[in-house]
Design a protein with these regions (language model features):
Chain A
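Conserved acidic/glycine
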Residues: 1-75, 259, 268, 273-362
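A residue-level signal for beta-strand positions that form part of recognition/binding surfaces
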Residues: 14, 85, 248
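Short, histidine-centered active-site or binding-site loop motifs used for metal coordination
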Residues: 21, 92-94, 189-192
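Cofactor-binding active-site loop characterized by glycine-rich and histidine/acidic residues
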Residues: 49-52, 56-183, 199-205, 210, ...
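Short, well-ordered beta-to-alpha junction loops that form the rim of enzyme active sites
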Residues: 92-93, 253-255, 326-328
Length: 362, 325
């Protein structure tokens, strides 16, 4: 028998709708209503300003280490496609999406300020907490999708992870399960070109990360991750498909981590300034703003007003947070929430500390 | 004597062993190009001095990192791989628990796996329970492994050199808080045998048994106890597996009292094993019940103030000791 080709439909597309100058490719326009466009812009701006403020707070020692999101604000385009009943499964670089989904800025500050309250998910908001072990949350999103199918509800789970996460076995097992069980899971890979100090080129030998979908026979697409319109359009296609029973999709958002990995490092040590400058030209907020101005949806005055408004919102959240933490923490709180009902052995340990503390007071 | 932090001492051990034996290589996430351009970190400068074939930055893949160690060690290389934080060993655990630990046995002793898995552990840097979770008792529950957990820079250096030369898989756990605390380290070549405890303070009233970061806490506690008229002996186990029963039992038979101190959570913690050994073999020497001073049975809290309550300190220790005097 001669060798013969196996017929496979292998295709990976790249989608960009707004170019770097903010010019729209009309044929690809996802026709987002004006008010949603403005909400998306505001959400991106809020995320940028909040990120900047958190960096100041971190430098002042008021909050601990966190992972800045600068440059990755267009992710809100994906979160915007989700319905309230859908689930958002973040890694640790999805603050913009978490805020879009209703998480409060105070709660983010609680997390990085070192309070367990930060992980608390308010009633009615289907976000999972931040996940630290890289890539592990992809598996949760398959489990969530499985439960949605099981119950016959038409929800979708969208999981975010980085380019580095695609090197973990968890990611591949999640993709395989999702494809085999056809779960309504959208895999949203934020390829920001760096995994701490390892560049994308040394993370994976594959030309694209999106093509990893092909091995599992699910659709894979690369989106311009700094173009919120492309992110929205690509995510919508995937979410609609998942919701209508079409199974999972892998999306690669091609973007860039403009800031440090976390506030504990200095990227100048391992990457060139020139690379950063190149990506600054593709800033997702600048580009989107140009587009909105071109359409007269934003004016100088409008931008200024919105920026002022956003800064106020950040300040007010910070004030509420400060007031809350001003009340202090009760060491005994650390025993709560480990179990649904506190086991007697743990209760004894809590009481032991309680005794110790009251003795100290005396 | 030179003063080095544990990070520097580990660095020296790696350097010396790499110079001594070409089969020794290093792999892990950020072991070469690191975000910490900090000379106190264990692998600082090694990439520059030994090149990218011997100091391998890997993709984010703990299972593959540990698997690389298993596979390359059976070929006679001596890999020293790094798992960035202790909780991530769960991802590498198939390779360590089911393979590194068992393949020698399964091969009827034919194959050897001279590998070292280094991992950073310890709470105290406000990074929450998915970064901080001391799992040494898990590792010590795996026959076929050796588990080393040094408490001083000098011990770290001598033990790591032994671990690299050892023909068994060694899990080498470094508490990150120790990376920055200097201590004396001999200038000349030396190794410290794996499986040998060290009496860090000689005393007659109570044996405080500990390891890793808690050894420092034990010594501080012993100081306070001395001021209160209690002469404590501090036994640093240094190796959990194989355990130096002799040093442990000799100390407890002498003092008649035992307090075990570790940072890991209590239930199923390694203190239980120590207490069991003493109950089996030295019960008659005990003048009082033994005590455990440990982290509580909860995940490490995110909050730095709560974390301070979580990590056992010298006051907790002193109170426990005084309670059995
Ligand atoms: C299982 C695991 N291994 C290692 C780490 C340490 N670590 C934290 S972030 C990171 C890189 C992640 O890169 P990527 O997936 O691209 O996400 P990004 O940080 O760029 O958003 C690593 C290795 C971790 N948190 N979890
Ligand atoms: Mg990345």
């Amino acid at each position: 028998m001669p060798r013969k080709a196996i017929n496979l439909t292998c295709k990976v597309e790249y989608l960009s709708i707004l170019d770097e100058t903010g010019k729209l490719d009309k044929k690809l326009d996802p026709s987002i209503p004006d008010d949603l466009l403005l909400r998306l812009y505001r959400a991106m701006l809020l995320a940028r300003r909040f990120d900047e403020r958190m960096l100041v707070l971190q430098r002042q020692g008021k909050i601990g280490t966190f992972a800045p999101i600068k440059g990755q604000e267009a992710q809100v385009g994906a979160a915007a496609v989700l319905e309230p009943g859908d689930w958002l499964v973040p890694s640790f670089r999805e603050m913009p999406s978490e805020l879009w989904r209703g998480k409060s800025m105070e709660s983010v500050l609680f997390t990085y300020g070192g309070y367990n309250e930060g992980g608390y998910i308010p009633e009615g908001i289907n976000n999972l907490p931040v996940s630290i072990p890289v890539g592990s949350q992809t598996l949760h999103a398959v489990g969530l999708g499985y439960a949605m199918k099981y119950r016959g509800d038409k929800s979708v789970a969208m999981v975010f992870f980085g380019d580095g996460a695609t090197s973990e076995g968890d990611f591949h097992e999640a993709m395989n399960f999702a494809a085999v069980f056809r779960t309504p899971t959208v895999f949203m890979c934020q390829n920001n070109h760096w995994a701490i100090s390892v560049p994308r080129s040394r993370q994976s030998h594959s030309k694209t990360l999106a093509q990893k979908a092909l091995a599992y026979d699910m659709p894979g697409i690369q989106l311009d991750g700094n173009d919120v319109l492309a992110v929205y359009a690509g995510a919508k296609e995937a979410v609609d498909r998942a919701r209508s029973g079409g199974g999972p999709t892998l999306i690669e958002l091609v973007t860039y981590r403009m800031s440090m990995h976390t506030t504990a490092d200095d990227p100048k040590k391992y990457r060139s300034e020139k690379e950063v400058e190149e990506w600054e030209k593709r800033d997702p907020i600048v580009r989107f703003e140009k587009y909105l101005r071109g359409r007269n949806l934003l004016t100088d005055a409008g931008v200024e007003e919105m920026d002022e408004d956003v800064r106020n919102e950040v300040r007010e959240a910070e004030e509420r947070w400060l007031e809350q933490i001003g009340k202090g923490v009760d060491p005994l709180d650390m025993f709560d929430h480990a179990y649904a009902e506190m086991p007697p052995s743990l209760r004894a340990q809590k009481e032991e500390l309680e005794r110790e503390l009251s003795e100290k007071k005396r | 004597m030179q003063q080095l932090t544990m990070g520097q001492a580990v660095n020296q051990a790696l350097r010396e062993e790499m110079l001594r034996d070409f089969n020794v290589f290093i792999a892990g996430e950020g072991v070469g190009v690191s975000i910490h351009d900090n000379p106190l970190m264990p692998t600082a400068g090694l990439l520059k001095d030994f090149g990218p074939e011997r100091v391998k930055d890997t993709p984010v893949s703990e299972a593959a990192i540990a698997g690389l160690a298993v596979g390359s060690s059976v070929m006679g290389l001596r890999p020293v791989v790094e798992i960035m934080f202790n909780p991530f060993v769960t991802i590498a655990s198939d390779m360590i628990v089911n393979h590194a630990a068992k393949l020698r046995y399964l091969s009827g002793g034919k194959s050897t796996f001279p590998l070292v898995v280094r991992m950073k552990s310890g709470a105290g840097f406000g990074a929450g329970c998915q970064h901080s979770h001391n799992l040494e008792a898990w590792m010590a529950h795996c026959p076929g492994l050796k588990v080393v957990m040094p408490g001083t820079p000098a011990d770290a250096k001598g033990l790591l050199k032994s671990a690299i030369r050892d023909d068994n898989p060694v899990v080498f756990i470094e508490d990150m808080m120790l990376y920055f605390i200097p201590g004396p380290v001999p200038e000349e070549e030396y190794t410290i045998p794996i499986g040998k405890a060290d009496v860090k303070r000689v005393g007659s009233d109570v044996s405080i048994v500990s390891w890793s970061k808690m050894v420092g806490v034990a010594l501080k506690g012993a100081q306070i106890l001395a001021e209160n008229g209690v002469d404590a002996e501090v036994v640093d186990l240094r190796t959990l597996l194989p355990l130096d029963r002799e040093t442990l039992l000799t100390s407890v038979r002498k003092t008649g009292r035992l307090v075990v101190l570790h940072e890991a959570t209590r239930t199923g913690g390694f203190a239980g094993e120590i207490c069991a050994i003493v109950a089996e073999d030295a019960l008659n020497s005990l003048k009082a019940p033994f005590r455990r001073v440990t982290g509580p049975d909860i995940p490490v809290p995110f909050s730095p103030p709560l974390e301070r309550f979580y990590i056992p300190d010298e006051n907790n220790l002193v109170e426990a000791v005084l309670g059995i005097m």
